Amino acid sequence: MAWLAYMQKEMDQQIADFEPKSNKIWYSPPGGGGGYYTETPNPEYEALLRKRDELNNISASLNSKESREAGRTLLVLDNSSGDHFRAAVGSGDIDNADHVMVFTPGMTTQATPGLFGKDGSTGSPVRNSENILDKSELAWKPGDKGQETAAAVTWLGYDAPNWSETLRGTDSSVLSSKEAQSAGPDLASFYDGLQETHHGDPHLVAAGHSYGSTATGYALRESNAPDDVVVWGSPGVTSVDASDLGMLPDHMSAVATGDDVVAMSGRYGGSPTSHPDSDFTSLDTHATGDLTESTGHSSYTDKGTTSLEGISQILRNQQSTHIDHNSIGIQ
């Protein structure tokens, strides 16, 4: 990844050239007498140092043995469009796989720590994507054997809301659709570009967790590329009507645990699993056979859960065998 090394070199030069690295302020005590300078860090310089640390973490993660064995690639890295790095990580052969999922994570996700951990580790959103790939039992890693292949993109091409923005009540908080709406056109363009550059016509799945599912909903309004959509822990996908999202009703799935208060809210267009007019099919989260129950807001793609198997069946382009018995999508 020569261009990543170039970005690191360029940022090192920016840091070396940046002035002033600190701010000096003259302080005169009341009543006169000797004054003195106080020196404080320059916030812009400190922000640049943090971005260099992030960039180094990204490089270490992608060059790790684990990433090489998983065939991970850096598809997007943008340092200019928002407050944080925006990135997209590929797992598997994105250009040639039969089945491709584009997964958009939600609130508090950043490029690092997030998609990429510290000290060469991998963040949980990428692991969530790869849990789905593993459970699909399709070939996706270099050396995997199988007639059908799969790949996933963990897409963070937007500024996901964080707790600071939410507690301050800004319009970039999770209580506002602003960031999801801003993400929509870029994510739609990514879907379209992936389909156009793919060798053959892939089975393309749009996937999203939490606030990322809302961004997914805005993207679906602007792209016809995805064949299926599956969301989990969703506060709403902008609409529960298939025609609004450009989808067929039997290609829309959603997952919500019984104690996920985010999914219960239906804040952005209604709850896909409980709205009476929803075209989404609700997938089961209860224990079934050897599969365990999912609880809360963040366990949907945990290994061994019923919800993970249901989601992976969507990636395989199969009708899920784990449909909630109260699903409003069952006719």
Language model feature labels by segment:
Residues 20, 29, 38-39, 213, ...:
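Intrinsically disordered, low-complexity regions enriched in small/polar residues
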Residues 92-96, 106-202, 220-331:
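Lipolytic serine-hydrolase domain surface
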Residues 82-84, 211, 234:
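Mixed-charge, polar/low-complexity N-terminal
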Residues 1-98:
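Intrinsically disordered, low-complexity charged segments of secreted bacterial virulence
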